[in-house]
From Swiss-Prot:
Pathway: Amino-acid degradation; L-histidine degradation into L-glutamate; N-formimidoyl-L-glutamate from L-histidine: step 1/3. One of its GO terms (biological process) is L-histidine catabolic process to glutamate and formate. Contains an active site 4-methylidene-imidazol-5-one (MIO), which is formed autocatalytically by cyclization and dehydration of residues Ala-Ser-Gly. HAMAP family: His_ammonia_lyase. Belongs to the PAL/histidase family. PROSITE patterns: PAL_HISTIDASE. It comes from the Bacteria. This is Histidine ammonia-lyase. It catalyses: L-histidine = trans-urocanate + NH4(+). The gene is hutH. There is a cross-link at residues 143-145 (5-imidazolinone (Ala-Gly)). PANTHER family: HISTIDINE AMMONIA-LYASE. One of its GO terms (molecular function) is histidine ammonia-lyase activity. SUPFAM superfamilies: L-aspartase-like.
Amino acid sequence: MNTMTLTPGQLSLSQLYDVWRHPVQLRLDASAIDGINASVACVNDIVAEGRTAYGINTGFGLLAQTRIADEDLQNLQRSLVLSHAAGVGDPLDDAMVRLIMVLKINSLARGFSGIRLSVIEALIALVNAGVYPLIPAKGSVGASGDLAPLAHLSLTLLGEGKARWQGEWLPAQTALKKAGLEPVALAAKEGLALLNGTQASTAFALRGLFEAQELFASAVVCGALTTEAVLGSRRPFDARIHAARGQQGQIDVARLFRHLLTDTSAIAESHHHCHKVQDPYSLRCQPQVMGACLTQLRQTKEVLLAEANAVSDNPLVFADAGEVISGGNFHAEPVAMAADNLALAIAEIGALSERRIALMMDKHMSQLPPFLVKNGGVNSGFMIAQVTAAALASENKALAHPHSVDSLPTSANQEDHVSMAPAAGRRLWEMAANTRGIIAVEWLAACQGIDLREGLTSSPLLEQARQTLREQVAHYTQDRFFAPDIECATALLAQGALQRLVPDFM
């Protein structure tokens, strides 16, 4: 069990990855408590003094001008959660719900939200007990925060809706009881604090980033394997070429290729004096294309890490000044744009991989048997596997369309520009699955190509990559049912089988 002491505003990317991958036992760092209590005291003072403050004693959205009587404040917060839990679609899996919950706790514990420590501790208790609220995947436009998803999360705190406990969907009240927990009653501002925020959008995009990192590393390894399979040159990875341009991502990717390929191999020596002058772009320009993708991954990391540690509530409580100020930190435009840029990178990683697969199919370009199989005609080899890769690459081109340029006004035009960040992040998952399928086909094809260079071997690391596959998937001597091999290679990639061969690049 992963144990984590949460210091609000200081989550690292590796901690977020661990939260996504594994159940966690959270403990709130004691340094957060004074700030949390001070913000609650500020809210209580506003109520006691009869001052009007949005979200504390007013309605919401277009109804913000409606003053709410003190005796209705608790009911106001409960009603807010119930009415806003209007999501649709399949439930998010436990890993995604857990990540959203931890992001929410991290934001609330910063001490700008006016929410009691006991409510934050109730959220922590849900995480620690493995009680996962049923959160539908769809229903947020990423401003004013992720209202519907976070309302569904908050329902479980109230004992409403459904939650999953030990793999079983239960009424939330039952799940809480089985876990030894009690529902909470919300005080002034607490419902709004729970619902306002970009935590669902950020979690969606973070998953996309985590998957993109694996895809990037796997594609670099497969690109190096393909370079060997088609007797490509190592010269385009010369450090001097990339230093002359000065693009850091490109420089770093070329270094990764030099690490994987080493100075030479038996395959490289076999064509050292060949007549070829230049390789096709899908080989020669790998550092340039993958370097640009790496730059996007790094920029996305910076944006999402900042957002993961941000306060995206509204209004914000500045206890030291005794003020509650309305702003727009709930607007997830930074997340939407980061997800859009990441989508371009995921699409290009797959597109370049597909072009290398196509290169291996062409006997004139690869100097290998057509479609990587002997006795062609009787055998079709990798012919349709390449078609599958092309289909996946084409789907990704459509999915890469930017979401952040779209907006539909909501809440009777009070919320007249929105980010569409949840959709921007969520489509990354499908794109990642598509790209993983493409890379799986390339891995199969490149290893087949190297096998066909009979008696010749590649570099030690690339031989490891080939051996890892060959332990699960046999060499193709004649046609066989192909889909299980793609499924096997895809599963190995998802487990990080090739990623572990690549030094840290983020």
